[in-house]
Amino acid sequence: MKKIIILTLALTNTVLFAKENASLERPEKGQGESGMAQRVMANCSAPKASKELWLNNVRTIVYSGGDMWWDLNGNNQAYYYIPAVQNRNTGVSSSFAGSAWIGGLDAGGQLKVAAMTYRQNGIDFWPGPLDTINTSADPAVCAKYDQIYQVSRSEVDNFVASNGKDITPNILNWPGNGDVSKNQGRRLAPFVDINNDYFYDPATGDYPAYDVENKAEKDVLGFCKTKLFGDQTLFWVFNDNGGIHTETQGVPIGLEVRAQAFAFKTNDEINNMTFYSYEVFNRSSFQLNSTYFTLWTDADLGYFLDDYVGCDVKRGLGYIYNADPFDETAQGTNGYQDYPPALGCDFFKGPLADFGDGVNNDQDSLTDEPGETIQMSRFTYYNNNYGAFPPQTTNPSIAIHYYNYMTGFWKDSSPFTSGGNAYGG
């Protein structure tokens, strides 16, 4: 059995795992892009860019629309290989797809949601920053930012050590600034501003904002001041206002998201991990209430019909593991064979909690302490549209379905219950 997992932060956070079955309604080759392109009626073109994150024992891929871990432009197969392999045909993947979901209510109670899954029905995200004045997306800007920028810690170290002489194309082309003539944010990708002129210029010594001096400085709330992470980093910008929300059928929020995917090369367990950071800006003129940030995960641990999912509440960790000691190769999918691993999905740091809300958001012994962050608040799953499952527990198709899954309810707004399949118990 295969389920879709949802981890949620109640900004708030959620982890959502989707559980699929054999046929799972995955997109056929080419279906996702063509079916979606016919439905997008707004200005920006669908996101197309992708880039591999492949530094340590993980080989995976991310897309400029915020979705990741699957081969959208190839054979629509899983693309999160552990261990990393040169020949993907011989590799075993532990996840099929993933994306960030965000939803909430405006002051009038109108639901606004942005999400991505398999692009079968459409998309809710487009590349590029938004106009900070009127929240609009410019098709030319979307096209310009339909790319993923890559940089490594080693090349920045070398740049600084050589006093700016050893400059690489990655450093030179780093998108440090938005276009203020188009009302974009002055700062875009994080960089160290040597002369404090707010303008990214490697010729004056500016560089992508790794902690080159290894100071590990923290701000007044105890958070790391460093803005760029990893030994290798991918950076991209996307928004939810570049067109009609054909994935969720929802109302756009006006979000600009600056994302990082990064990895470390180590000799311990971190060598089997990848990390993701999202800086979310609400560019609209309204406040979003009852807001949830969700990591949607279609986790396939090798062969996808013998997996279970679970949640460690204290750690805020969603996980997937094999149902038996042997993960077979079947239905064109490579399994892990003997001693299959488990895969975890964790929120290391959520958003800052509202001060004085009286809630122990980080589940420690203190309430409303300075710098308190929100940890995972929901863990849910749903079944793909295949098999004898109650229809209320299957794929979401409209905005309220997505929001219900993010907030711990089924599509019909009934709560998850204890025991069985968690529906109607």
Regions found by a protein language model. Name each.
Residues 1-24:
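Bacterial Sec-dependent N-terminal signal peptides
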Residues 19-425:
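A long-range scaffold signal marking pre-active-site subdomains of enzyme folds
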